[in-house]
Amino acid sequence: MKSQKKRPINSKNIKNNQEPPRELIQSIINTFSKGQKKEAIIELDALIKDYPLAPLLLNVSGSFCKSNNQLDVAVTKFKKALNLDPNYAEVHYNLGITLRELGLIEEAIKSYKNAISIKNEYPNAHYNLGNALVIIKKYNDAIKHFELAVVFNPKFAQAYYNLGLANKSIENNFEAGLNFDKALAIKPDYAEAANDRGVIFQNVGDIENAIKYYQKSLAINPNVAKVYNNLGIAEKYLNKIDDSIKSFEDAASVDPNFARAYYNLSGFKQYTFNKDQVAAMQSIHMSDSVNQFDLIAINFALARANEHLGNQDKFLSYLHEGNRLRKKELNYSIDSSYKSFLNIYETFSLLPNPHNKSLQNITLTKRPIFILGMPRSGTSLVEQIISSHEEVFGAGEINILKKIYSQITRNILPNEKEKNILSEENLMLIREKYFDSFAHLSTYHNIITNKTPENFKYIGLIFSIFPNAKIIHLKRDPRAICWSIYKSNWGGKGYRFSYNMDDLVKYYSLYSKLMDFWHKKFPGKIYDICYEDLTTNQEKETKKLLEYCELDWDENCLNFHNNKRAVKTSSSLQVRQKMYQGSSEAWKKYESHIQPLIDGLKPYLKT
């Protein structure tokens, strides 16, 4: 005779068909919570002997084990409870929490989903599922579950905050800002949310409000180095040098191991580190427990500090080490750049010019000016000059074109046709998307500059969207450009080619050849300006620049250093100074130490 499959037993199918006494269970939990853990566990084990088929007791037992950091035992207890009652949502949830602590993210996700499938209106399960999805970088999926968490619990401040972080991770600044605002509305003393609200304001160029929220965060919790560091960066963008230095010093004071504070202080040429600061930097550098991010930052900081002191050997040693570590961290290969440039050629080589004449006849309410070239070529300086004109607003670096290009080449734009991704219909959508990226700007100006250097890759896209666009291309001695790039520790994953001299030479070659391609494809439409000519003949070159942009003469453009706008680039300090010459010669001091770079760039020197 076949044995019948046993029916799962729920919490009512136990001793004498009764549930364990709830009052007794709560009493045991209270005992455990008071710190009398051993007594509570003894009482619970005795109760389990009386009610061996009660999943509720196994759930409590698993929770006790988890609290005692007996994670593997807790997993066993939760799984036993689920064998008795597979539809016990809370146990699936607790199992997910424990698996997450064990680092078993995929298994944790499965458990959270099981809990939600049984009990959809379960805000904590949606919240923790969102957190797990963030770990594996599935941000859009995470956002859906954070949104459900706040639907089912509208007062869930932490869920709003993490929803903001997820939106921030995909550069959805508008939504992230709203989420942080909601978290703060529920919990006004939420220091982390105030800090990240400041970050969002900074991301969109509203530096004054960024400072306000950093200060609010510090008023709530004055012991967070990261927030002082953020405040210092924002103050630097507004040329509040003394305030900026103090904020970075405060960051290092709160946490002497906060490497980024020393790196940012090293960016001020007039700043001299004291003995305690030097000792702290060297301690970080020698530490066995320092993480890669901080080790890279401290190498660049020590390099700058020694450069300012004239210690050439130490400067170069720390600089080379910082670059070596950064290249290793990014796992960059020049082959990836070869592929991306090849994709550009394939996309635009056969495209007629102009390929969509109808767009030329559409009047724009906002007129874009693009300032581009290699990083460290002078794009910030030129934007500072042009944005000093009364009719122009300098938007800084707006990276929307890179995103748009990625979308059209991956065929994910709406309404696209298989072989016509740059159809008029799609180009209108792209144009709208470009202007949407400026929606946050508080400006009455109709002429807006975008000085993202990397936009040199997307000149074909720019002229497709804006056939009458003004494009200013910065040219500079390639030795000055590449040496300056090599000395910089760029944030995020931008400019990944920067940390190796051979990579720099090869990338410069790719850039140079692509610019030749664009000039041939769009003859007479790209305005080349030489950085050295601009610094030598400021007024003459400025007049030519404004003439190309179809702007009347404005004396303010000669006094660009008086422009009070926020400058969110590594050149924020330089553009506050009057025009100076000689910066393109800085590499000569180290020529014998960077010979591979110098030799590799010889084919691209002006003759």
Enumerate the predicted regions with their spans:
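Conserved alpha-helical positions within TPR/SEL1-like repeat arrays
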Residues: 29, 59-66, 90-101, 124-135, ...
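Structural marker of alpha-solenoid helical repeat scaffolds
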Residues: 50, 84, 118, 152, ...
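PAPS-dependent sulfotransferases, especially Golgi type II membrane carbohydrate sulfotransferases
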Residues: 266, 278-289, 299-368, 415-446, ...
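Phosphate-binding active sites in nucleotide-utilizing proteins
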Residues: 361-464, 474
